[in-house]
Swiss-Prot record:
Belongs to the MurJ/MviN family. Disulfide bonds: none annotated. Involved in peptidoglycan biosynthesis. Transports lipid-linked peptidoglycan precursors from the inner to the outer leaflet of the cytoplasmic membrane. The chain crosses the membrane at residues 32-52, 55-75, 96-116, 122-142, 156-176, 186-206, 227-247, 270-290, 308-328, 355-375, 380-400, 408-428, 457-477, 495-515. This is Probable lipid II flippase MurJ. It holds the Pfam family MurJ. GO terms for biological process: cell wall organization; peptidoglycan biosynthetic process; regulation of cell shape. It is found in: Cell inner membrane. Keywords: Cell inner membrane, Cell membrane, Cell shape, Cell wall biogenesis/degradation, Membrane, Peptidoglycan synthesis, Transmembrane, Transmembrane helix, Transport. Pathway: Cell wall biogenesis; peptidoglycan biosynthesis.
Amino acid sequence: MSRKDNEVSLARSIFNILSGTFCSRITGIFREIAMATYFGADPIVAAFWLGFRTVFFLRKILGGLILEQAFIPHFEFLRAQSLDRAAFFFRRFSRLIKGSTIIFTLLIEAVLWVVLQYVEEGTYDMILLTMILLPCGIFLMMYNVNGALLHCENKFFGVGLAPVVVNIIWIFFVIAARHSDPRERIIGLSVALVIGFFFEWLITVPGVWKFLLEAKSPPQEHDSVRALLAPLSLGILTSSIFQLNLLSDICLARYVHEIGPLYLMYSLKIYQLPIHLFGFGVFTVLLPAISRCVQREDHERGLKLMKFVLTLTMSVMIIMTAGLLLLALPGVRVLYEHGLFPQSAVYAIVRVLRGYGASIIPMALAPLVSVLFYAQRQYAVPLFIGIGTALANIVLSLVLGRWVLKDVSGISYATSITAWVQLYFLWYYSSKRLPMYSKLLWESIRRSIKVMGTTMLACMITLGLNILTQTTYVIFLNPLTPLAWPLSSITAQAIAFLSESCIFLAFLFGFAKLLRVEDLINLASFEYWRGQRGLLQRQHVMQDTQN
C-alpha cells in the first residue's frame, strides 16, 4: 500500500483542492451580484441561463468527475510501468475527446440552426443564445482533460483557480454593458464567455506541456483508449440521467412560472456551493486511494479512510444545512436584491433554496458511497439507481410543483426527498457487495448526532436572539415585527448577513468547546486540515504523557 494513502495525505489534498476552488467560487459570488444588479430578473436573462445550462450539459456528461473516474486509474496504472507509455496514452485520449467534442458541437449547431428558422420570438432568443454559447463546451472539455492530468500530478490548486478568469471577464462585461439594450448585452455576454472559457483552458496548457516534455521517446507498446470505453460509457449514461433530470427541473420550473428557471438557477448556484466545493473535492481526492484499498483487499486501511471522510463530510454538511436554512434570506439579499432585481424574486429564491436545504447531506455523501462501486469497476448499480431516482424526481417535482405547493419550491422539495432515497439504495447495495463496510455509514451518522444537536442548539439560540431583539425580519419571510431600518443598501444587507453568521458561528463553536464536540472543534483547527491530530486528541496524548 502506498504510504500516501492515509488520513494525512487526504487532509492535505482536500485542503489544496478546496483552496483553489474557493477562490473561483468567491469570484462567482461577485458575478452573481453583478448579474442580479445590472441585468435583473428579465425573461431574456432566464433564456440566457437556460442556454448556459444546455451548454454545460455536454461538459457534465463527458467531463468533470466522469472523465476523471475513468481516466485517472488507468493513467496511473500505465505511468507505474512507463512514463512514456502514460504520456503517449494521454495524447491519444486528449485527441479523442477533443475531436468528439468538436463533432458533437457542430452537429448540435446544425440542428439548432434549422430549428431556429421555425420558432417564435421567445424561443428564438433561447436557441440563439445556446448556439452562441456552444463553443464554450469545447474549451470546457479540453480544460477538463488537462485538469485530470494535472490532478494526477497533484496540482489541485491551479486547476481549481482557473475558472476565476471566466468570472472576471463575466463581471467586467456585465458592468461595462449595463446601459446597453437588454437583448444586445445578453448576446454580447455570451460571446465574451466563449473568450473567457478559451483562456480558462489556456491556463492549464503549460502544466500539460511540462509533463509531456518529460516523455522523450515513443513507447514500445501503444495503449488503446478502448480500455476506457466501458467506464466512460456507463459514467456518461449516469451523468446524462442527472443532467436530463436537471434540465427537466428547469423546464418544469418554466411550466410552473414564467421566470421559474431564473429562481431555480439562482438558488442552485447557492445550494450547490457546499456540495461542489467540498463534497466533490473530497470525491476527487478519495477515489484513487479507496480504489487501491479495495483492489488490494486492504479493507482495514479502506475503512479508516472512508470513516475519516464520511465523518468529516457529515460534520461540514450539517453546519452547511443549518446555515442555509437560517441565513437563506439575508444571504440572498446580499447577492441579488440590488438594482432591477425585485423583492418578490428574492423571496421566491429563498423558498426554493430552503427546499433544497435537506438535500445537502445526501448529495455530498452519495459520491463518496459511489466510490465503493467505482473502486471495483462496477458502474451499472449507480446507473440504475440514478435512473430510478431521476424518474421519481421528475414525477414528484410535477406533483409538488404544479399541484400540491403550486410553486417552484415544490421542485426543490422533490429533489431533497429523492436525494435521501438515492443515498439509501447506494449504501444498501454497496453493503451487499462489500459487507465489511456495511455499518460504516450508520456509525458515522450516529457519531454526528452530537454535532447535529450542538448545531441545532446554536440555531435555536440565534433565533431566540432575533425574537428578543425584534429583528426577525432579517431571517423570516413573514417576520414577527415590522422592519426597523431599511435593508435596501448593500451595506445594510451585508451587516445583517455577517451579524447573523457571526452570532450563529460563535454559539456553534462556543458550545462545541464547552461540550467537547471534537468533530466540530477540529474544523476550526489549521493543524487538523494539515492532517495532524485533532485538538482534543492532542490534549489526551499530553495528559497520558504527563501521567
